[in-house]
Amino acid sequence: MTQGKLSVANKAPGTEGQQQANGEKKETPAVPSAPPSYEEATSGEGLKAGAFPPAPSAVPLHPSWAYVDPNSSSSYESGFPTGDHEFFTTFSWDDQKVRRVFIRKVYTILLIQLLVTLGVVALFTFCDPVKDYVQANPGWYWASYAVFFATYLTLACCSGPRRHFPWNLILLTIFTLSMAYLTGMLSSYYNTTSVLLCLSITALVCLSVTVFSFQTKFDFTSCQGVLFVLLMTLFFSGLILAILLPFQYVPWLHAVYAVLGAGVFTLFLAFDTQLLMGSRRHSLSPEEYIFGALNIYLDIIYIFTFFLQLFGTNRE
C-alpha cells in the first residue's frame, strides 16, 4: 500500500498518460504539493517534465492583423485611440519615406496655389485697367464666390473626387482660381503699399508658425474643441459686425474682428500643419494630400485677408 501511494513528483513520465488511455481514475493525495515559485516554473529546474503546464510564450497568441503596436501607430498617442475618421488614419508613420513624400507633395501643391494667387493679386493691384474692370463688375465676384463654395464643399465632403486623379486636381485648380479672384478683387481696394506690407507680414507669420509646428512637442491636433469654440466666436462676431458696421455703432469693432480672425486662423494653420506630420493624436492619411493642401491654403489666404482689414489703407 505504501508503495502504491506515489507522489505526483515521483510519477514516471508515461504513467499518467497510460492511466488516461486505459480509462482508469486514480485518487490524488489528500494534501497537494505546493506550487512552484516563479523562478522554478520559468526555469524548469527541480521539476519533472509534465508536472506543470509550460510557461506562456512572450508573444500574444493573436493573429498578426489583430495586434496593433502602440509605439508604431499614431492613433495610440496620448494613451487612447482616436477612433475612425474619414480624414484621419491609423497608418504607421514609422516609414519615413512615405511621410516625406506625402509632405513634399502637399507643399508642392501649396506652393503652386500660392504662386497663382500671388500673380492674380499682383495683376489686380498694379494693373489699373484690370483693377477698374473688376471693381466695376461685382457680378464676377459673386460668381467666383459661388464657384469657390461649390468646389470647396465637393473637395471637403466627398472623398471620391478628392482622392481620384484627375478629378481632384481639376477641382483644386478651379477652387484655386476662384479663391485667387476673390483675394485679388479684395486687394484692389487697398493701396499698393498696404498690400505689399500685408503680404510680407503673412509670409513671416506663416513661415514662423510652420517651423514652430514642426519643432514643438505641443499637440495642436488635440485642441479641436478649443478651435471650434474660437471659430464659432469668430462666426457670430462676423454676423454682429455685418449688422452694426453699416450704422457705425461701434467703429473699432472691425479692428477687433480682424485681430480675432487672424489669431484663429493662425491656430488653424498650426493645427493643419501638424496633421501632416504624424506622431500626433490625429494625422491625415497619405491619400489626403489634396485635403491637406486645401486646408493650409485657406488658412494662409484668410490670414492675409484679415491682415488687410487690420493694416490696409483704402485707395483714395
UniProtKB/Swiss-Prot annotation:
Antiapoptotic protein which protects cells uniquely from Fas-induced apoptosis. Regulates Fas-mediated apoptosis in neurons by interfering with caspase-8 activation. Plays a role in cerebellar development by affecting cerebellar size, internal granular layer (IGL) thickness, and Purkinje cell (PC) development. Residues 1-46 are annotated as: Disordered. The chain crosses the membrane at residues 106-126, 138-158, 165-185, 194-214, 225-245, 251-271, 290-310. Interacts with FAS/TNFRSF6 and BAX. It comes from the Eukaryota. Its main location: membrane. The keyword Ribosomal protein does not apply. The keyword Transport does not apply. GO terms for molecular function: calcium channel activity. It is a multi-pass membrane protein. It is found in: Cell membrane; Membrane raft; Postsynaptic cell membrane. It comes from Bos taurus. This is Protein lifeguard 2.
